[in-house]
Design a protein with these regions (language model features):
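Intrinsically disordered, low-complexity regions enriched in proline, serine, glycine
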Residues: 120, 194, 233-235, 245
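Active-site-adjacent loop and "lid" segments of alpha/beta metabolic enzymes
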Residues: 190-211
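N-terminal alpha-helical interaction modules that lie
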Residues: 1-147, 151-158, 162, 244-264
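Short helix-capping/linker turns of helical repeat alpha-solenoids
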Residues: 99-100, 157, 166, 173, ...
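TPR/TPR-like (Sel1-like) alpha-helical repeat modules
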Residues: 147-154, 208-233, 237-240, 250-257
Length: 264
């Protein structure tokens, strides 16, 4: 026990950095509740109006989810078609307010629900998606749209510097956007087989290998964790084989150097 406690704060920070490559004790996120809820819609009345429209659409989708799960009486015979109409309504809101990141994040989430997290790989079965018998061209367009929405949401909300503040609402949306993109990358990596070519020809991911999807998923999980999602933070290392291997090697070396007390 005494040997393990001889590690300095710097030693622990270095070891934590190996276990969590995105961690940095000097650059914690600065949350400021006095900032506008969305940095790109600073007029309170406009934000309230836009966010209410979004909430109404999201509530409608949540009610459809409950209907699909059998948790509430059916109010429509075509819940999936109504779900798609909700996505179209989000699209209209985004067209009117293209810099409203939350709507983009929610549209990406709805597209994941409809088309599944393996949407980048044509022909891969995903039992969790709502739509069946998907057309390859349609799925490719949707995959590009979902990733573009998440890219844009992340760009819109990411603080301009490591020491810039972010509002709680913007931080939550940013965390969700990183985590959603990570989920898509992670499921793509899990389903990736030799010969697979991601069906997003105009995007960088079209050239990625399985390991590149794994690494990108880990980075996004880490950033999702940095902005508040503890589950994403935990997944950051477990989904990165390089970090896992490195962490295991370092832990074994430290156990030999400092004794069993460093086991954790």
């Amino acid at each position: 026990m005494a040997a393990a406690s001889s590690l300095s704060r710097h030693d622990f920070n270095v070891l934590e950095k190996i276990k969590d490559p995105e961690s940095n004790p000097l650059t914690a996120v600065i949350v400021d509740s006095t900032l506008p809820k969305d940095p790109n819609i600073t007029d309170t009345s406009v934000y309230d109006r836009v966010s209410k429209k979004e909430r109404d659409i999201v509530l409608a989708m949540q009610q459809l989810e409950m209907q699909l799960a059998g948790l509430r009486p059916a109010s429509t015979t075509e819940p999936i078609e109504e779900y798609r109409q909700c996505v179209s309504r989000l699209g209209e809101l985004i067209s009117e307010y293209p810099d409203y990141a939350s709507a983009r994040n929610n549209r990406a989430q709805a597209l994941r629900r409809l088309y599944g997290d393996t949407m980048l790989l044509t022909g891969v079965h995903n039992p969790n998606r709502l739509l069946r018998d998907l057309d390859g061209a349609e799925t490719s367009q949707v995959a590009t749209l979902a990733l573009s929405d998440l890219d844009k949401a992340i760009t819109l909300l990411t603080p301009k510097s490591l020491f810039a503040s972010i509002s709680p609402q913007a931080g939550k949306t940013l965390s969700m956007a990183h985590t959603q993109r990570a989920a898509i990358y992670h499921m793509t990596a899990k389903s990736f087989q030799p010969g697979h070519v991601p069906s997003v020809p105009e995007r960088k991911e079209a050239e990625w290998t399985k390991i590149e999807f794994e690494e990108a998923a880990s980075r996004d999980f880490a950033l999702g964790g940095r902005y508040g999602n503890e589950i994403a933070k935990g997944l950051a290392v477990s989904t990165n084989p390089t970090a896992k291997l490195c962490g295991q090697m370092v832990r074994e070396a430290m156990k030999k150097e400092y004794g069993p007390a460093y086991a954790e």
